[in-house]
Amino acid sequence: GENIVYESTNDTANTRFDDGDTSNWLNALAEAAMMTGFERNGDIVKLAAYAPMFGNLRGTRQWAVDMMYYTNTALVRTPSYYVQQLFMQDSGDYKVQSELTFASGSAPTLTFEGSGTRGDASRTVDQIYYVVSADEETGDILIKIVNAGENSVRFNFSLAGMEGIQLADIAGV
């Protein structure tokens, strides 16, 4: 249920994970979706690492996609870098019970058609991934929502045992 990282057969630019020279927003969305699962299952997932981290922007590199690229004078951060930064800077101490209810009545999904090394089977995955946690020191409630699809999704959000909470800030990547 946590796997949004799946190769697509769409002809749209930057939809395949192996066709670019650098990380793109599709990579970053897939990573963010996966990381909501890491955080939601923090009692099981003790550690996660991102590799490879650095690649030479103008030279030979071992991997097709890295988190950051460098030259002699510059450091280029990819969308994946900013997703990692968001999850690092805004992680709670414990998970908060929550529920999303969708205006459509059911959770939206995405379907990918397999091809090449993945076989011919199609795969359906969730479009929305989320996690809610709380910072013990500040009392902040941290809500991370990833829409891995192209369409807007309307939903209501409820937090167990919490009423009258005011929205203080919205941060996005």
What are these regions (language model features)?
Residues 62-71, 99, 145-146, 154-161, ...:
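Composition- and surface-driven signal marking solvent-exposed, interaction-prone regions
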